[in-house]
Amino acid sequence: MVTETKESIPEIALEGVSKRYRNAAVALEGISLTVDRGEFVTFLGPSGCGKSTLLKLVSGLSPVSEGRVRVNGMTPENARDLISFIFQDATLLPWRTVEHNVGLGMELEHAAGAARKERVARMLDLVSLSHVAKRYPRQLSGGMKMRASIARALVSRPRILLMDEPFAALDEMTRDRLNEELLRLYEEQKWTVLFVTHSVAEAVFLSTRVVILAAHPGRVAHEIKVDLPWPRTAKTRESKAYEEQVTQASRLLRGVYQP
């Protein structure tokens, strides 16, 4: 008999997962998927295919209707200390400075002031926001607000980041720059990342794997391994390999849209 060790357990495992609502609408049906430690998996698919719902199931924010979700071998509820969730809206408190927004979680946990200050400073440095620590959200650009939101998520030292269209509201150049910064942090911190986007180009640039969901009900239609070298930079987007993978993903994505 082989005993499953902690190292052999997938970081995230969904086994026959379905999500139904009281009005009988089916958001997801029969999702089976494993994600290993350190993977960057991005979800693409039509609106309403359950991409955001899937992240909520993994985080424990919403219960499954059928099947099961395990995070590092635990239920999502028991694994919450491992997870940080980053939403499309930065949701910074307007009456708090950047550093006080970033440190809010530690403050609520009654962390010691010196330790909190040191960790907040470290996170702001990681996302290149040390120079605006004393500013308020209204004084920040959209890109700065999102970097502050990422810093706030990192303060808890997560192993897993769940990111639901975090850069969707930003202009293309800002989004590209933040994608590059995110990958720099990803390579340094060795997180496991689940990312939702509607941009094929963004999905290919960021990911080790792209999962395409079909809708009505939401289900896995295709999985694509992204074979692009690391580190990924602005020059990656100019490569033939990148263009080929974007073309492949775009073709498969078109196939799941219903006429």
Residue ranges and their predicted role:
Residues 44-46:
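The feature captures the beta-strand-to-loop junction immediately N-terminal to the Walker
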